[in-house]
Regions:
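Well-ordered alpha/beta subsegment
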Residues: 28, 116-139
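Bacterial N-terminal signal peptides that target proteins for export
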Residues: 1-10
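N-terminal secretory signal peptides
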Residues: 25-70, 74-77
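Loop/turn positions that initiate beta-strands
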Residues: 88-90
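Short, surface-exposed secondary-structure edge patches
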Residues: 81-84
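N-terminal signal peptide c-region/cleavage motif recognized by signal peptidases
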Residues: 19-21
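Beta-strand-rich cores of mature extracytoplasmic or soluble domains
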Residues: 95-122
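Bacterial N-terminal signal peptides
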Residues: 9-17
Length: 139
């Protein structure tokens, strides 16, 4: 039975590979020496963000709904994916300012945002309570 299950799993993975399916890339967010995975969105802007890593930023509260940080230079967005849901924990780029915004609560879609990826609940809580501590993103 185990051999059949293993064989089926391998064949399923090979089928995805042959069909050209891609697995979502994961990057790391580090706060106070603890690492939290972030699943990147599957779009060109998320890949461009990942290409700039490692990157260390300081986040601040922007109202009560998001934490924002300002990378230098600002992130340019070329291929915005429009009309996506923004559940809490979504990491985005705000096009007009080129800053990163992580949403602490569910938020309505906004054409000025492009999706970068999704933090885990544990990662979101770490960022929410990070104050002005450095936050490092890496491959």
């Amino acid at each position: 039975m185990l051999t059949k299950t293993f064989t089926a799993s391998v064949l399923a993975c090979l089928g995805l590979f042959v069909a050209g399916a891609t697995m979502a890339e994961t990057i790391q967010m580090t706060i106070d020496g603890k690492h939290y995975p972030i699943e990147l969105a599957e779009n060109p802007d998320a890949r461009n963000f990942a290409a700039r890593l490692p990157m260390t930023l300081t986040f601040e509260n922007f109202g009560s709904k998001e934490r924002i940080a300002y990378p230098k230079p600002a992130i340019k967005v070329e291929n915005t994916v429009r009309h996506f849901d923004i559940p809490q924990g979504t990491m985005t780029i705000y096009k007009p300012w080129g800053n990163i915004a992580v949403f602490l609560v569910d938020f309505p879609w906004n054409d000025d945002l492009t999706n970068l990826g999704k933090l885990t609940d544990e990662g979101l809580e770490a960022l929410r309570t990070s104050g002005d501590k450095p936050v490092t993103f890496s491959q």
